[in-house]
């Protein structure tokens, strides 16, 4: 089981049908296919269990996990520039004249098409977890752009996907700032030794504290001077550590060894059973963490 490393959390803004049987067919229509000779990038669905299953969905306890795969052709700008300059120089020498800008632009497309078939590919995979019980969708990535790209693929596959980023009633950065100022987080959470503080003024600067006592006078002085906490490392019930960000995302998830070893009695050779058990364990813990976090941050924004 690929334990999630980050969480971008989204709320379904209205109820839609998310049944695995239907989704299996819908995702199949957008299954991953490799780039053709003239494709810059391709994205599609692959089995979350990899070579161990052909299914594009894996379901347990109302939780669904799916996996998007992306192939991108790598064409460094200097390579394109060098090939283009050589092509321009050759044509200008042959025709004994300087090429116009429109001609150079047209040549750039030609050069791009000639280089694409020989370009290397970069592959990446993004896991997505659909919590049909709580109406949430979680994407395992650190950037909003990557999450939005994956959601866009799912929206295209399903025909409709009404989601909004999970947001709180109170600004998250103000709640995090109060936790650091008071030296105490919400029930179930403990402050760790890492935070990022930003000034409310545009040119006020950023402070990144690592391996530091966040209740120290130095940190308090930054808060008194008008800085707010935009990232804060937290521990949840000594089970999961993570960095809470002011955009509502959870970064650098770290599950405690005791939690990760809970299914060690299952033979690792039985990949399907271990994957299923780890998925149930992980989603159960994260669902509880998210609910606890929503309460601790003052409740979800009313829609």
Curated annotation (Swiss-Prot):
Its main location: cytoplasm. It comes from the Bacteria. This is Recombination-associated protein RdgC. GO terms for molecular function: double-stranded DNA binding. May be involved in recombination. Keywords: Cytoplasm, DNA recombination. It comes from Shigella flexneri. It is found in: Cytoplasm, Nucleoid. GO terms for biological process: DNA recombination; regulation of DNA recombination. One of its GO terms (cellular component) is cytoplasm. Belongs to the RdgC family.
């Amino acid at each position: 089981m690929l334990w999630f490393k980050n969480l971008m959390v989204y709320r379904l803004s209205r109820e839609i049908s998310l049944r695995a049987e239907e989704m299996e067919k819908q995702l199949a229509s957008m299954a991953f296919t490799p780039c053709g000779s003239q494709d810059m990038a391709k994205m599609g669905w692959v089995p979350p269990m990899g070579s161990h299953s052909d299914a594009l969905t894996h379901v347990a306890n109302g939780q669904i996990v799916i996996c998007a795969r992306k192939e991108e052709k790598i064409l460094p700008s200097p390579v394109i520039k060098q090939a283009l300059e050589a092509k321009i120089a050759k044509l200008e020498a042959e025709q004994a004249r300087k090429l116009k800008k429109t001609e150079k632009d047209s040549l750039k497309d030609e050069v791009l098409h000639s280089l694409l078939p020989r370009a290397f590919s970069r592959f990446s995979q993004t896991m997505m977890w659909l919590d049909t019980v709580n109406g949430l969708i979680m994407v395992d990535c650190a950037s909003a752009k990557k999450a939005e790209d994956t959601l866009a693929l799912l929206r295209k596959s399903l025909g409709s996907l009404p989601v909004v980023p999970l947001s709180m009633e109170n600004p998250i950065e103000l709640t995090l700032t109060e936790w650091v100022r008071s030296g105490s987080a919400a029930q179930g959470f403990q402050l760790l030794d890492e935070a990022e503080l930003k000034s409310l003024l545009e040119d006020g600067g950023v402070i990144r504290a690592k391996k530091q006592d966040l209740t120290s006078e130095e940190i308090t002085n930054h808060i008194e001077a008008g800085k707010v906490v935009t990232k804060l490392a937290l521990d949840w019930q000594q089970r999961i550590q993570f960095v809470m960000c002011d955009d509502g995302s959870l970064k650098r998830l770290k599950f405690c060894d005791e939690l990760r070893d809970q299914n060690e009695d299952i033979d690792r050779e039985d990949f399907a059973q271990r994957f299923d058990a780890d998925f149930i364990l992980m989603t159960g813990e994260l669902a509880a963490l998210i609910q606890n976090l929503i309460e601790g941050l003052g409740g979800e924004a009313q829609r």
